[in-house]
């Protein structure tokens, strides 16, 4: 009983067996270890683990959950999948006149925009339609998402990142108001009568900065037709200002934009907007396709596009379990797809909406690393290039610009209040690839978390492992002080070996107790205790990696599951 209490007290003060560089980064950050999950290993399913800290603890993932959504979509649909939007007609076309309705069925293409309208109108005209004596009917039944928004999440329901999904998406649900003060102009970028703009701006002869550089925007969406009020004083020296907000329903915006494009092309429409499913007997006119999925998921990852991720989740639900798509179907689809790949062995994550804009999503570093490893082995660089490239593009373009990490990391980031996460791959200077997952859920400040992540990733670039397939922390410097070595016969001759393999079983802020060391002796292990930043217990030496790895499993089972292989000069211990 006494031994159990002593061991429990010892383990309570024990620091997980982490490489010195990572230990130092954590200490520098002043973030409690309980707030941090780390899982770093050689890339690939059989890669050796380098660092593990709370890797099985559920965390708020924020946008790194998109990795699961994106990978499941690629597995199910393929890189070349394209979203469709189908155009039908009812009635007949006589002498260039459609006596019937133009019917549009949306299947959730999140990229459909006003830039697609010229091509769509051209194909309508090419079908022999010069005017439409009927309505424009929109079928948005492929998604069953209701009208709930995320205003309860952060009280910014009109911000583009909060845009909710719709099967008839248009311009990512964002309405753009163009303000040009030096021309005294306020216009809608795309014709849209589903909302009203009231211009109450006062132009003043002041420098374009501070409170004179941008309009005050007030939105009233309590009415059937939302109203936008532009208020305040703005410098007449300011250039164009684009106000981009979620103001109205995307299917309404699509209707007004399509109708305006048709009429501008000389195709008048006599009817109005109708919402219903495609009538039986409707004739297919043509199908408009999105860009390939590979392009879309790249934007989803690099720009962390929440709307795209939501649509991917819903699409998977419909493809797996039939229309209409629902969030629950989508969640189940992602779980089933990833389970089939064997990457949800340890714990089932809670995916929620697929984009990470949620306080209910939960994920472990280990599961995320498993997904990244599977994707790495299956698709290699094609997959990696979907993620943000350090110092080059996406959410880590500025973060690692001008650092040693530039062009050496492919990452997905995730940020919410009290959550700062990053996951992906790092290429070290010696050409090896590592899977890196760092999840920090803390109240100590996201800036501290970002700095910690940056330090660890920079350290990984300089990290040197052993021979092929060996993952080890930095070598202990020759100045490390030997504290104690037991008297069991060594496994390798110190006369002939310059370096040998060791198993680091623990790292302590205080010198480990005799009870802990006696446990190792009673198990028949050779060990050494060295001191640099912490007191580290190393079992070994072993002449080959195979010998060391055979022992590693036993130590992880009976001593410390965070134990790992390392490699040192034998002279350090003599």
Say what each PLM segment does:
Residues 37-41, 101-105, 135-139, 167-169, ...:
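Soluble periplasmic/extracytoplasmic beta-strand elements of cell-envelope proteins
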Residues 200-210, 340, 466-499, 508-574:
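Extracytoplasmic
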Residues 52-72:
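Short active-site loop at a secondary-structure junction
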Residues 4-13:
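Sec-dependent N-terminal signal peptides
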Residues 49-52, 303, 313-478, 483, ...:
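Small-residue-rich helix-loop
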Residues 92, 213-221, 420-428, 528-529:
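Short, surface-exposed beta-strand/loop micro-motifs that present aromatic residues
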Residues 17-45, 49-58, 118-127:
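Beta-lactamase-like hydrolase cores
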Residues 20-26, 76-345, 463-483:
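Conserved serine DD-peptidase/penicillin-binding transpeptidase domain
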